[in-house]
Regions:
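Catalytic beta/alpha-barrel core
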Residues: 1-2
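Conserved phosphate- and dinucleotide-binding cores of soluble alpha/beta proteins
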Residues: 6-136
């Protein structure tokens, strides 16, 4: 299940099986599906794992983004998943955006790059968050 048009197309082109794309309005800038239809659909679903992208990640405010509609969809995904994996490159660490959509204690795993500040990585681990450092 995804709200991202590019990800849905990539997965289906790669033969990933049955890809569910949420319905709703499409934001031109991100090509993400948002709105009431997407939220109602997500309310009916449960996922073992949610992979969530973010615009910003801080210890105090968790995950945030600039758009309230995208934040609502991401928040619903977080709520309805057993495990939450955050995809966040190091340039987004320590930044805050307008709308917070998940607190730090909702995160199970953060996948970031080796540019992440070591003190930040240590703080995530102190909060029982697994950190995966990817080479780029």
């Amino acid at each position: 299940v995804t709200n991202s048009l590019p990800i849905a197309l990539d997965l289906s082109s790669a033969g990933a099986g049955d890809v569910q794309l949420l319905g709703g309005s499409v934001r031109a800038i991100t090509q993400a599906v948002v709105g009431g239809t997407a939220l109602r659909t997500l309310a009916l679903m449960r996922a073992d794992v949610a992979f969530i992208g973010t615009n910003a990640l801080t210890i105090d405010h968790g995950l945030s983004t600039a758009d309230a509609q995208e934040a609502a969809v991401k928040s619903a995904m977080v709520t309805n998943a057993h495990t939450m994996v955050v995809l966040c490159d190091s340039t987004k660490i320590g930044n805050d955006y307008l709308v917070s959509f998940a607190p730090l204690d909702a995160i199970d795993v953060v996948i970031t790059d080796e540019g992440a500040p070591e003190t930040f990585v240590e703080e995530l681990r102190r909060n029982d968050i697994k950190v995966v450092l990817a080479r780029i």
